[in-house]
A protein has these predicted regions:
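RNA-binding accessory domains that recognize and position tRNA/RNA substrates
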Residues: 1-50, 54-60, 64-72, 88-317, ...
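Gly/Ala-rich beta-loop-alpha elbow adjacent to hydrolase catalytic centers
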Residues: 78, 82, 87
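Active-site regions of oxyanion-processing enzymes, predominantly non-cytosolic
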Residues: 320
Length: 510
């Protein structure tokens, strides 16, 4: 399989670069700038991309790399900081720019015959985000593009196949960004494009069968996208050798537990174990209102219930997880041995032993996981499931959690989802849900005064969840949702809409 290395120097778009490469049907993997040269030599990469980063190359505490990487005969593309770093490594001069460039900037291609600018307009819009720039080109390199404030916006050494661009081709704001990356991958690196989800499924199923043999596999199934797709792949590979353990703590959306069970027992050949334990969790949460304490209790009790069920399985065999690629990436922003902790990485108790851990999705980004899920025939509702907090509705009920509050919130949330679906508006939203703030308000229903629950609606639009804006849902849809909730959901007499962006707020209320 063809591979491109994305060498991480701490930029915010590093995962996006890898995803854009994969969008071109070429596999990309990310390594931190601390990866030894020997590892890169052994990687059999078709090309290397130096990422951006927040540092200045002339600060000796900034991330650097040995010059030998440019002598491996592998094509290299430097982006932003990576562009400056390559120039610095081979004798160029980098300076703090007289005028920084941020946002959309007009780029002029000065060498039309450049391989990476093939079929790119002479003038186009690119996305810039830099305070430093290359001032003097190193020997053997030539300028291929410029902007008004950046005379060296792109350069190349065609003979050595080393390229640099000061802008960010990976972001959608760069008009020909996808084409520029495509040109580097196909025109310069000589890739053919063998990274496709159909072949991934076939290859993964084959390797799973070889590894598992006739042993058993246990997977913790949450009903989320990652564990669901992992279950689908494992089921296709080993069928009844797979046992999925689904802990229903009673804090899921309305009828979601039944939907998950029905989906996997009807579509896939596997053993499905459902543990219904709502009462257990409600008892453990009795009298607790602090959000962090609730999270801790839910996590601790889930861990206990899940592993108690695992211990009941006669044969352990292998343990499978829905770990995906972003869970595994080492970040160039910190120490190389520091890996992000994530809920998809499960800690095992000391008294439970397995042959090995299997992570069939560990090479995929989330969008690729969804693509695999669709090809496996997993329902759209699961494949495109919105982000849902690990503690479930436990962090959407402000204050103490009771069975009655769960029912109110589940019913209100179901109405919201139903109306968004009926109006075809759900595709416009990154996330939407109801919150029970724990506030009662005075109302009038018929001839009677009421003092019942207030329900808040939260809906946001975002590309990355780092920032988010409140969604501008049409008033007529909001009015219909409010009317239905107050009429159909018992013990609710008022509905409000949260119009707070992130920052200063967060998407979830707790």
């Amino acid at each position: 399989m063809e591979k491109i290395l994305v060498l991480d120097f701490g930029g915010q778009y590093n995962q996006l670069i890898a995803r854009r490469v994969r969008d071109n049907n070429v596999y990309a993997e990310i390594l931190p700038y601390t990866a030894p040269l020997s590892e890169i030599k052994e990687g059999n990469y078709k090309g290397i991309i130096f990422t951006g980063g927040p540092n200045s190359v002339f600060d000796m505490s900034s991330p650097h790399y040995t010059k030998e990487i440019l002598e491996l005969g592998i094509p290299v593309l430097g982006i932003c900081y990576g562009c400056q770093l390559i120039s610095w490594m081979v004798g160029g001069n980098v300076e703090t720019a007289e005028q920084s460039e941020y946002g959309k900037i007009d780029l002029t291609v000065t060498k039309k015959q450049s391989e990476i600018f093939a079929d790119v307009d002479e003038t186009s819009v690119v996305w810039m985000s830099h305070t430093d720039r290359v001032k003097v080109m190193p020997s053997g390199f030539e300028i291929t593009a410029k902007t008004e404030a950046c005379p060296i916006a792109a350069y190349e050494n065609e003979e050595k196949k080393i390229y640099g661009v000061q802008f960010h081709p990976e972001v959608t704001h760069t008009q020909f960004g996808f084409k520029i990356l495509h040109n580097f991958l196909y025109n310069v690196c000589g890739c053919h494009g063998d990274w496709k989800m159909d072949s991934f499924i076939d290859d993964t199923v084959k390797s799973l069968r070889e590894k598992i043999g006739d042993k058993k596999v246990i997977l913790g199934l949450s009903g989320g996208v990652d564990s669901s797709v992992a279950a689908g792949l494992l089921s296709r590979a080993v069928g009844k050798q797979l046992t999925c353990v689904f802990v229903d703590q009673g804090l899921m959306r309305k009828d979601e537990g039944n939907f998950v069970e029905k989906t996997f027992t009807s579509l896939f050949d596997m053993n499905f174990v459902r543990v219904n334990c709502q009462d257990h969790f409600i008892n453990a949460l009795k009298g607790v209102s602090d959000p962090e304490q609730k999270r801790k209790i839910i996590g601790t009790e889930f861990y206990k219930v899940f592993w108690d069920e695992i211990r009941k399985q006669a044969e352990k065999g292998f343990f499978a997880q829905g770990t995906i690629y972003p869970d595994c990436i080492e970040s160039g922003k910190g120490d190389a041995d520091k890996i992000k902790t994530h809920h998809n990485k499960v800690k095992m108790p000391d008294d439970v032993e397995f042959i090995d851990v299997i992570e069939p999705l560990s090479s995929l980004f989330k969008d690729e996981v969804r693509a695999v899920g669709e090809k496996l025939g997993i329902p759209h509702e699961l494949v495109w499931r919105q982000p849902f907090p690990g503690p479930g509705l436990g962090v959407r009920i402000i204050g103490e959690i009771t069975k009655e509050k769960i029912e109110v919130l589940q019913n209100a949330d179901w109405v919201l989802r139903d109306e968004m679906a009926k109006n075809g508006y759900e595709k416009n939203l990154a996330q939407f849900f109801c919150v029970l703030p724990g506030v009662n308000t005075v109302g009038v229903m018929g001839d009677h005064r009421t003092y019942d629950n207030l329900v808040a609606i939260r809906a946001v639009t975002t590309d990355d969840f780092m920032t988010a804006d409140w969604a501008k849902i049409p008033y007529d849809i909001l009015a219909k949702v409010s009317n239905r909730i107050t009429n159909e959901v018992k013990h609710v007499n008022r509905v409000v809409y949260d119009i707070t962006s992130k920052p200063p707020g967060t998407v979830e209320w707790e």
